[in-house]
Amino acid sequence: GQGDAGGYLNGNYEYIKKRIRKYLEYSPQAKRMGIQGLVYVAFTITRDGSAQNVELRTSSGFDSLDESALEAVHRASPFAPPPHAARVVVPIQFSLK
């Protein structure tokens, strides 16, 4: 049941966030304008590890950051396959540090 997906997420949440960050591209325009923000993206990791139904849960308020966040999830796919499809919500931080 859901218990397995919970275990998968507990063990892999940091890995999932790191993997997405690896594929995150800060648009040069957003960088130039000093735009920063936090985006929450929701998606399902299917049993073969692919990201499906990727959607914006909470916007950063900037289209370019929102788009980059969604793209990063698609590029980071596939992830380590879960025992059952798992729905994930991941915060993606854009900061110019």
Predicted region positions:
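Short proline/glycine- and basic residue-enriched helix-capping loop/turn segments at helix->loop/beta transitions
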Residues: 8-41, 67-97
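A short acidic/small-residue loop/turn micro-motif
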Residues: 58-62
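Short, acidic, Ser/Thr-enriched surface-loop or helix-capping motifs
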Residues: 45-46
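Acidic/histidine-rich, surface-exposed loop or edge segments in extracytoplasmic proteins
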Residues: 1-6
